[in-house]
Amino acid sequence: MLSLRLKKIVSLLDSQDKVVDIGCDHGYLGIYAIREKLVKSIILTDIKESALSMARKNVKNSNLDIPLIVSDGLNNINASDINTVVVSGMGTSTILHILN
């Protein structure tokens, strides 16, 4: 079940968006957005492989083809693959660091 916070974030996305979810945590936002065809594509990222483990498990269980990438912010993301960035569930200083 998607939290109210994640539902609000998803409601801001468009069906033509190519999204990267930075710090995806459990991957619920991406799984929901792809399953419901709310975005064109999504890439799930987190800073460490261990942080991606739950998202990787959830994506596998969803039977969806969603890429998961270890990345510090946008460092390992090809800009041509995305047009929308989601950064949520982190403190202000962390978000500002990622955006810089």
Residue ranges and their predicted role:
Residues 82-89:
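Short SAM/SAH-binding signature in class I
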Residues 16-25:
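Conserved class I S-adenosyl-L-methionine
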